[in-house]
């Protein structure tokens, strides 16, 4: 690989030295073309956007399909006409009798009574309380069953840490928020605290209830264990740009919980034939409520090959990021988190040894994201993220006079949405639908534009095909689990993709096909085993490409099937 320029642009407050005619020619070369025109050379913003898409992890398989846990009935039968409840104070008894109605007036086995006890516990849980139910020794031949309900009341909180790296006192304050001695366990608060503690990198927390010192109370004892100090992954794929190298290798390393307070230091490296990317990040809990702060920095350097090699086109992009995140809802069935992030980008491009363009962008992004697990009809899972972005783009004053991209100079705003739903159709079949899109209120910098092509979009087209300010992609996949032997899983799927793009929100000049769509269909295979994931997919274009030239794609490749592969190995238990 050729050495990449570390500082291709060094603005010194001067006007650029090229004559006016040369500037006009360069401006025409880098302007976004109308559909059917040759593609311009990619710039730092496009390369940055492509790198961020390549770094995004593929969506995981959905949670396992729901199965019934009730064992088959066995042993003697008896008929129950009435349930006598003892120890019930937090709920009206009528609520529990209504929940037990399916078990009255019919022959039951002992296993059926155990299912009835679970229904009582579920009723408490649905109202936000923790309880246990059991059957005291009794004679049930008369048709009356006595159920003893032990309503959980908090006694005290203990920690078993045994000289661990994790700070037990900090974790105890996180789990114990909202718990008061002698009062009933508020199940949502208890569940939230335990889940937040287990969200901390490099920390495992298990809560056990034990009989308390005071009658009717239960003590919560936390078993705190350390996870591995180091984690990470390596990956190889072909989702790079044709001009910087399709093959890319990615390495990630994390240092988990080095301080004992649930922090994480991360580093990411990506290498392509003509691309180098490096990033670092740090996250830290701010108190025990779940609030987290994050800092990040990335640096990217590129050089264009293929037909742009003679231009000696190269550039760099640097990104600073700071954010605050807070879990609005944390539970085993649904989660919602909010994040506010500030981002600053500096993007530089050069050609033929001359500084070409310098752009600076700053924005604030408010993100809401979450997921939910659904019951019924085999079960399902939904995950979503919504971003609302407001920012400002600045170009060097000398460039504004000639650059058609100057239309992106100034303030911008946009909204992004990603929605994914998985639904089990049977023990081995599930359907996945994914909608991804954005809407801008004006023209955007290339680093912020939406793209249809690539393995995360319309999979029958190459990376960076059909970029624009606003757009959307819908992916539909039908999956079949072919085998789950040992600890591995083989998953085959058919897919169909369709996307629409608006190249410029506020077009200038002649753009006959500012709006158009692309479609593709294909098949794929995924293999998971012990942290190793292999993805292979083939996408075939369906219909024509209004944005292409003479039947080819915008990057000059012929229209035909696209083969995508990605191999990833995680180094964490």
Each language-model region and where it sits:
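Transmembrane beta-strand segments of outer-membrane beta-barrel domains in Gram-negative
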Residues: 292-446, 551
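C-terminal transmembrane beta-barrel domains of outer membrane proteins
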Residues: 403-573
């Amino acid at each position: 690989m050729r050495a990449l320029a570390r500082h291709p642009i060094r603005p010194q407050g001067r006007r650029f030295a090229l004559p006016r005619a040369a500037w006009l020619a360069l401006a025409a070369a880098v302007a976004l073309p109308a559909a059917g025109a040759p593609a311009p050379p990619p710039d730092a913003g496009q390369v940055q956007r492509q790198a961020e898409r390549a770094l995004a992890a593929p969506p995981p398989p959905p949670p396992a399909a729901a199965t019934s846990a009730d064992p088959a009935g066995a042993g003697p039968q008896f008929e129950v006409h009435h349930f006598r409840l003892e120890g019930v104070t937090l709920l009206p008894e009528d609520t529990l009798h209504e929940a037990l109605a399916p078990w009255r007036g019919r022959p039951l086995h002992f296993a059926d009574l155990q299912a009835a006890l679970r229904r009582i516990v579920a009723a408490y849980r649905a109202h936000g309380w923790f309880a246990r139910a059991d059957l005291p020794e009794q004679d049930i031949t008369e048709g009356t069953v006595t159920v003893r309900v032990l309503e959980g009341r908090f006694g005290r909180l203990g920690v078993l840490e045994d000289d661990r790296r994790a700070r037990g006192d900090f974790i105890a304050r996180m789990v114990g928020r909202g718990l008061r001695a002698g009062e009933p366990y508020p199940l949502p608060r208890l569940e939230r605290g335990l889940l937040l503690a287990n969200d901390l990198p490099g920390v495992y927390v298990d809560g056990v209830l034990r009989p308390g010192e005071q009658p009717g109370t239960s003590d919560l004892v936390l078993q705190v264990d350390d996870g591995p100090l180091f984690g990470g992954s390596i990956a190889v794929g072909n989702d790079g740009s044709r001009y910087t190298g399709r093959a890319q290798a990615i390495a990630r390393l994390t240092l988990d919980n080095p301080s004992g307070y649930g922090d994480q230091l991360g580093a990411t490296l990506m290498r392509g034939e003509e691309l180098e990317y490096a990033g670092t990040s740090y996250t830290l809990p701010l108190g025990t409520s779940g609030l987290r702060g994050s800092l990040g920095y990335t640096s990217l350097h590129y050089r264009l090959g293929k037909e742009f090699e003679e231009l000696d086109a190269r550039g760099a992009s640097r990104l600073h990021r700071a954010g605050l995140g807070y879990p609005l809802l944390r539970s085993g069935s649904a989660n919602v988190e909010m994040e506010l992030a500030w981002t600053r980008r500096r993007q530089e491009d050069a050609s033929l040894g001359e500084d070409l363009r310098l752009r600076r962008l700053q924005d604030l992004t408010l993100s809401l994201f979450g997921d939910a697990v659904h019951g019924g009809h085999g079960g399902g899972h939904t995950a979503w993220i919504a971003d609302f972005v407001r920012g400002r783009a600045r170009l060097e004053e000398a460039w504004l006079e000639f650059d058609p991209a100057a239309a992106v100079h100034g303030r911008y705003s946009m909204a992004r949405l990603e929605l994914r739903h998985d639904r089990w159709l049977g023990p081995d079949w599930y359907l996945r639908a994914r909608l991804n899109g954005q809407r801008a209120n004006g023209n955007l910098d290339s680093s912020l534009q939406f793209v249809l092509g690539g393995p995360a979009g319309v999979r029958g087209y190459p990376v960076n095909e059909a970029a624009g300010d606003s757009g959307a992609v819908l992916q539909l996949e039908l999956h079949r689990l072919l085998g789950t032997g040992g600890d591995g899983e083989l998953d085959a799927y058919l897919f169909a993709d369709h996307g629409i793009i608006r190249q410029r929100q506020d077009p200038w000049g002649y753009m006959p096909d500012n709006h158009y769509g692309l479609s593709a269909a294909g098949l794929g295979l995924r293999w998971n085993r012990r942290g190793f994931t292999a993805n292979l997919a083939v996408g075939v274009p369906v219909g024509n490409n209004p944005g292409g030239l003479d039947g080819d794609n915008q990057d000059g490749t012929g229209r035909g099937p696209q083969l995508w592969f990605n191999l990833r190995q995680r180094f964490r238990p």
